[in-house]
Swiss-Prot record:
InterPro entries, A to Z: UppP
Pfam families: BacA
Primary localization: membrane
Free-text function comment from the UniProt entry: Catalyzes the dephosphorylation of undecaprenyl diphosphate (UPP). Confers resistance to bacitracin.
One GO molecular-function entry: undecaprenyl-diphosphatase activity
UniProt gene name: uppP
EC number from the UniProt entry: 3.6.1.27
GO biological process, one term: cell wall organization
Keywords: Antibiotic resistance, Cell membrane, Cell shape, Cell wall biogenesis/degradation, Hydrolase, Membrane, Peptidoglycan synthesis, Transmembrane, Transmembrane helix
TM spans (from-to): 107-127, 134-154, 207-227, 243-263, 268-288
Protein name: Undecaprenyl-diphosphatase
Gene Ontology terms: cellular component: plasma membrane
Location in or out of the cell: Cell membrane
Segment forming the signal sequence: none
Length: 293
């Protein structure tokens, strides 16, 4: 092989992804569990912390797979409600006389999931590459905080769980698409939409978590093969992904329990008070060169 041929082969040969360390895996899994359900953006925090302490992006595939642990926490925490919705939906499908509240709730979740599935599949490359820019993450952390504040001030917050309808579900479903941008927060986008629609905080949070189940489980399973040998980001072993998912589950369950109690008596504006200085700090670190975009 002459020199020109060698250089050409080297240029087109894919570069092997850097392997993640166990420390990085465990830390990021804890961060995932803590931030997935809080409206502060889990993907944004994973991106920031991974870049700040390890100088590399863990990648969207790792994030999607470890999210399976936090969604398992939702399945366990809301097991009774999920079982009621599933049985009610299947019963209604085969028997028109049994089409009650749970049957309708099942359809609301299904229909509201469609927008993020379509956008997620069509925009896969954009999500994994262009949008994972630290400047975008930091800017969105700051700007979207004002959406929380506005939702708290504008929303009446007087509608209960039984008052949820298909319009609410669709609005929250489209809001879930914003979560594809690191820095927005899946729960932040959907809960804010619920508040704008007049839902009370507990109902908005509960439906937000239920709505995330199909999309996150689908994304995690879809990204599972790529997590071992990603085109972007870092590679993790099967054992690392398994332990990371378990850690995210345990921490995520505790996070859900805390948030459901917190929202009963506290405004979501408290999270804006964290997001704004956090985003500004990341901008400063980027400007000083301590973080890579």
């Amino acid at each position: 092989m002459n020199e020109q041929t060698y250089l050409l082969a080297s240029a087109v040969e894919p570069v092997a992804a850097e392997n993640m360390s166990w420390t990085q895996t465990l830390v990021l899994s804890v961060v995932q569990g803590l931030t997935e359900f809080l409206p502060i953006s889990s993907s944004g925090h994973l991106r920031i912390i991974s870049e700040l302490f390890w100088g590399a992006d863990a990648g969207a595939s790792f994030t999607a797979v470890v999210q399976l642990g936090t969604e398992a926490a939702v399945l366990v925490y809301f097991a009774r409600e999920i079982w009621q919705i599933l049985t009610g939906w299947f019963a209604g499908v085969f028997n028109k006389d049994r089409r009650g509240r749970d049957y309708k709730m099942g359809w609301m979740i299904i229909v509201a999931t469609i927008p993020v599935v379509v956008l997620g599949v069509l925009g896969k490359d954009l999500i994994r590459d262009a949008l994972r820019n630290m400047w975008i993450t930091a800017t969105v952390l700051v700007l979207f905080s004002f959406v929380f504040i506005l939702a708290e001030k504008v929303g009446k917050k007087d509608r209960g769980y039984d008052e949820l309808n298909m319009r609410d579900a669709l609005v929250m479903g489209f809001a879930q698409c914003l979560a594809l941008i690191p820095g927005v927060s899946r729960s932040g986008g959907t809960i804010s939409a619920g508040l704008f629609m007049g839902l009370n905080r507990e109902v908005a949070a509960k439906f937000s978590f239920l709505l995330a189940i199909p999309a996150v489980l689908g994304s995690g399973l879809y990204s599972l093969p790529d997590a071992f040998d990603p085109s972007t980001g870092q590679a993790a072993s099967g054992l690392q992904l398994t332990i990371g998912t378990l850690v995210a589950f345990l921490v995520g369950y505790a996070s859900i329990a805390w948030l459901m109690k917190f929202v009963a008596n506290h405004s979501f504006s408290w999270f804006a008070a964290y997001r704004i200085p956090a985003g500004l700090l990341v901008m400063l670190l980027l400007w000083l060169g301590y973080l890579n975009p």
